[in-house]
């Protein structure tokens, strides 16, 4: 608050700072203060790019500012759910931090008070969720934790494998769910032809 354009998130034992410009001396001093207050292992900064291409995505990987570096991949927890993240994967770390409220809504099966995500009749049995453009399946894991059988679609096999690891981190069997590699819009047409239906589409 009071620092427009500068975002700081705690990611496990690390702080992740994000802005569209390099850190100023005052910002670095504030990060040092926060690191001491929260017993942080290391602090990273990521330069935000509005429309990053492949080269820019790699260059925009979070850079260590001070402290100990993170391992290539490590697990963090949010609302009791574990996710694998990485500061070495380019522009994104494997979890969209600004979607935490939506992940919480999936976990609770409620969009808001009096607005259930699925009909009450389905709460105590499996319901079907489709996660198009699934990335590393963060939403899929939350839906599965909430009792859904989840179909996840992504154009990247690597990210779908990452998603399966997220399922395993949460003691969820990936074999009980479906992971579809390919173009999401093409898969939607195929699923429609197969008369597949879902209670929730993400």
Model regions and ranges:
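Short, well-ordered secondary-structure micro-motifs
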Residues: 55-56, 142, 189-192
């Amino acid at each position: 608050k009071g620092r427009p354009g500068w975002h700081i998130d705690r990611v496990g034992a690390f702080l992740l700072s994000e802005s569209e410009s390099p850190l100023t001396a005052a910002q670095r001093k504030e990060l040092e203060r926060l690191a001491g207050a929260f017993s942080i292992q290391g602090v990273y900064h990521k330069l935000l790019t509005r429309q990053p291409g492949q080269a820019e995505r790699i260059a925009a990987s979070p850079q260590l500012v001070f402290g100990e570096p993170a391992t290539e991949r490590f697990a963090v927890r949010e609302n009791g759910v574990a996710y694998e993240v990485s500061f070495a994967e380019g522009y994104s770390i494997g979890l969209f931090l600004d979607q935490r409220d939506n992940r919480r809504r999936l976990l609770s099966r409620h969009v808001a008070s009096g607005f259930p995500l699925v009909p009450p009749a389905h709460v105590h049995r499996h319901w079907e969720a489709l996660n198009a453009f699934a990335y590393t399946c963060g939403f899929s894991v939350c839906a599965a934790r909430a009792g859904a059988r989840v179909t996840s679609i992504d154009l990247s096999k690597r990210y779908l494998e990452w998603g399966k690891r997220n399922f395993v981190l949460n003691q969820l069997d990936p074999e009980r769910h479906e992971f579809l590699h390919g173009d999401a819009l093409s898969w939607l047409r195929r699923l429609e032809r197969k008369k597949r239906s879902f209670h929730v589409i993400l």
